Amino acid sequence: MRVLGLDVGDKTIGVAISDVSSTIAQGITTIRRKSFVEDVKAIEEIVKKYSVEKVVVGLPKNMNGSIGPQGEKVIKFGEKLREVLRIPVVFWDERLTTLQAERFLIEGVDMSRGKRKKVIDKLAATIILQSYLDSQKNS
């Protein structure tokens, strides 16, 4: 089963996809946000292209575990997405994933700030999805 991972921000949506065995996540694109309708259309195309059966949406939480304003926006987006796609949409704790992604790009591949901005959301989506996939294998 293929699973889609999303890192939903105000300006962009990072997108990652799993392999068919739901073992390995790979970043595939970053969607520039325009409107809910256009954002969902772009996600729908990916869902159809890869025969996705589930979507994992990174849920930003505060360090104490509470949900703040950004988390509320993401929940609203995910719930609407579930209605449109008619496949399971689950939320996954994304605390520190963007920080992890940025640290990797700085330390791991010594990438410049300009290049980092282009791939950070896709990498964060990959980390979110891989974390989810790993948890499913271990449960």
Swiss-Prot record:
A Gene Ontology biological process term: rRNA 5'-end processing
InterPro entries to which the protein is assigned, alphabetical: RNaseH-like_sf (IPR012337), YqgF (IPR005227), YqgF/RNaseH-like_dom (IPR006641), YqgF/RNaseH-like_dom_sf (IPR037027)
Transmembrane intervals: none
Entry superkingdom: Bacteria
Main location: cytoplasm
Signal peptide interval: none
Record keywords, A-Z: Cytoplasm, Hydrolase, Nuclease, Ribosome biogenesis
Family annotation (Pfam families): RuvX
Any GO MF annotation of the entry: nuclease activity
One of the record's GO cellular component terms: cytosol
Cell compartment(s), UniProt: Cytoplasm
PANTHER family assigned: POLYNUCLEOTIDYL TRANSFERASE, RIBONUCLEASE H-LIKE SUPERFAMILY PROTEIN (PTHR33317:SF4)
Role according to the record: Could be a nuclease involved in processing of the 5'-end of pre-16S rRNA.
Family of this protein: Belongs to the YqgF nuclease family.
Protein name listed in UniProt: Putative pre-16S rRNA nuclease
Record organism: Caldanaerobacter subterraneus subsp. tengcongensis (strain DSM 15242 / JCM 11007 / NBRC 100824 / MB4) (Thermoanaerobacter tengcongensis)
UniProt lineage: Bacteria, Bacillati, Bacillota, Clostridia, Thermoanaerobacterales
